[in-house]
C-alpha cells in the first residue's frame, strides 16, 4: 500500500513538473515570438472584426471577405459610419495595406493642389478644377477626423491631411507640410502600403516606400485616441452623389513608441 502511494505521488510529481515545463516553454516561445515581431501588434486577425467597433446599425457593410476588411460605402448606421479600434494609442507607427476597389463616381470638382497646400487659380482668381474618377477614404489618427491621412485618387496623391491643409487658420508652413511631396499611389485596384508614424504632434507618412509627409506638425492634435477607417460617400436615387469609400484593408499592425 505504501509502495503504491509512493508510486502515485511520484507520478503526480512528474506530471506536475511536465506541466510546469510546458507552461514555462510556452511562455518562452511567446516571448521569443513577440521579440521576433519587434513589438508589432496585429489590429486585424484576418477572420472577423474583433478589436474594432462596428457602427451601430451598420447592417453588415463593414465586413471581412477573403481575409481583408471590405467596405462598400453603404453603411446603414444613423450616426457615424466609420470603423474604429476599441483601443486608444498615443505615439505609434501604424502599417497597413489598402486598395481602392473601383471608382464608379466621377468627381467633377477636384482642385489642382500646389506644394504649399493651396489650390491653383485661373487668371480670374477662380479655383481650377478637373474631373477625376474618385473614391475617398482615409485613416483617422488619435480619434480625430481632422487628423486624417487621406486615401483617394486626386492628382496630389494619398497621404495628405485634409483637415489641416484646408484649415485657413493654420500657419502656411503647417498647411504645406501636410501636403504630399509626391504622388506615390499605385493604380486603382492595386494594393498600397502605408507606414504612418505619430510622435507627439508630429506626423510622417510613407506610401509604397516613398516619404510623402515628413515630420508635419499637427497643432492641437489629441494626445491619444483610437485608429479609424473612414466612411465617405452617399447615393441619391440609386446613383453615387459623392466619392464613395469602396476600399479594402489588410495586414494592419501597430507598434507603440
Predicted regions and their residues:
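N-terminal secretory signal peptides that target proteins for export/translocation
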Residues: 1-10
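Carbohydrate-interacting regions of secretory-pathway proteins
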Residues: 29-257
Amino acid at each position: 500500500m505504501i509502495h503504491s502511494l509512493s508510486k502515485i505521488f511520484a507520478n503526480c510529481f512528474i506530471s506536475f513538473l511536465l506541466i510546469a515545463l510546458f507552461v514555462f516553454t510556452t511562455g518562452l516561445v511567446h516571448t521569443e515570438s513577440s521579440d521576433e515581431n519587434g513589438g508589432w501588434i496585429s489590429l486585424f486577425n484576418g477572420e472577423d472584426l474583433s478589436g474594432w467597433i462596428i457602427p451601430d446599425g451598420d447592417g453588415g457593410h463593414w465586413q471581412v471577405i477573403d481575409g481583408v476588411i471590405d467596405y462598400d460605402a453603404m453603411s446603414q448606421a444613423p450616426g457615424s459610419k466609420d470603423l474604429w479600434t476599441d483601443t486608444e494609442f498615443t505615439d505609434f507607427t501604424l502599417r497597413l495595406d489598402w486598395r481602392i476597389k473601383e471608382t464608379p463616381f466621377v468627381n467633377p470638382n477636384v482642385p489642382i493642389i500646389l506644394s504649399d497646400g493651396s489650390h491653383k487659380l485661373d487668371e480670374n482668381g477662380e479655383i481650377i478644377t478637373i474631373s477625376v474618377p474618385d473614391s475617398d477614404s482615409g485613416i483617422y489618427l488619435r480619434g480625430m477626423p481632422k487628423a486624417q491621412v487621406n486615401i483617394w485618387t486626386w492628382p496630389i496623391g494619398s497621404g495628405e491631411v485634409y483637415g489641416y491643409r484646408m484649415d485657413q487658420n493654420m500657419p502656411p508652413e503647417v498647411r504645406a507640410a501636410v501636403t504630399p511631396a509626391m504622388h506615390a499611389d499605385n493604380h486603382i485596384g492595386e494594393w498600397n502600403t502605408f507606414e504612418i508614424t505619430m510622435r507627439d504632434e508630429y506626423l510622417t507618412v510613407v506610401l509604397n516606400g516613398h516619404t510623402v509627409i515628413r515630420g508635419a506638425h499637427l497643432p492641437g492634435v489629441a494626445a491619444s485616441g483610437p485608429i479609424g477607417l473612414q466612411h465617405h460617400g452617399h447615393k441619391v436615387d440609386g446613383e453615387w452623389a459623392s466619392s464613395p469609400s469602396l476600399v479594402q484593408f489588410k495586414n494592419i499592425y501597430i507598434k507603440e513608441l
